[in-house]
Amino acid sequence: GSEMCIRDSLITPTDAGIQAAVRAHMAVAAYADPAFPEQSYAGAWMVIEGFEEVDDEFLERIFQRCHGQPWEIARTKRCVIRELSLEDLPALEKLYQKEGVTWRLDADGERIPGFIEPLFAKEKEKKYQQAYITNMYGYYGYGMWLVFDKASGELIGRAGLEHREFPDAVELELGYLIDPDRQGQGLATEVCQAILAFAREELDFPRVNALTDQKNVASVALLQKLGFYYLEDTDVSGSRTQRYIYEFS
């Protein structure tokens, strides 16, 4: 039949099946079966159109999504890349407090340069990340992830793929940050290569963008090493930045 149940995960073509699974606290995905038209699929974590990609990993991911467990995205030689969970916020805060990571204002209100936007105040950041987990990870299956040292389990960075609106289209943008104490070890290259491989294999975009300040020599060198080429200077959020492109040819 068109219903499948493995390890507390159910794939079903009917709203009745979905509601039964929800009541039983099971992870559930809907199968768009033409034999059961006019279903709403309310309560399902995703809707599939066939069983070609359904394997143990797929069912495990439905289970994790339903139970609020972060997905692991990739493993490199030295790192684990995975989704953020709310339990990671204290470690993320610690990383963002390091010198030069985020821009901030000095006593006179002048902007002290840094790499990225600072976090919100604690409760606001928690609400923001909860919505991000639900809406970005849950709906798109990608976003900004966390980078952990494979050996120690320590949080050493943040990297991933976001949407960026350009005048002609919404495209993917690569973002990355490595703990200042761990820079110069080739970790950013390792992590970004894994993310580009993920984008090539899993996502339906022809290319990935990266935005950087031309004064950020290390970032420009990294992008060139990864195979990005310079496209144009552009204005983003009121500041002039360089746009680089990586094509999936």
Residue ranges: model-predicted function:
Residues 1-6:
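Short, small-residue-biased leader/transition segments that mark boundaries at the very start
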Residues 10-45:
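Acidic, Mg2+-coordinating phosphoryl-transfer loop and its flanking beta/alpha structural elements
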Residues 13, 34, 210-220:
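Conserved beta-strand-loop-alpha-helix junction that forms the acyl-donor binding cleft
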Residues 19, 23, 154, 215-231:
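Conserved active-site alpha-helix within GNAT-family acetyltransferase domains
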Residues 23-24, 42, 156, 202-203, ...:
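Structural motif
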Residues 43-47, 224, 246-248:
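Short low-complexity, flexible loop/linker segments enriched in glycine and/or proline
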Residues 49-181, 193-202, 207, 211, ...:
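GNAT-family acyltransferases
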Residues 184-189:
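Glycine-rich acyl-CoA binding loop
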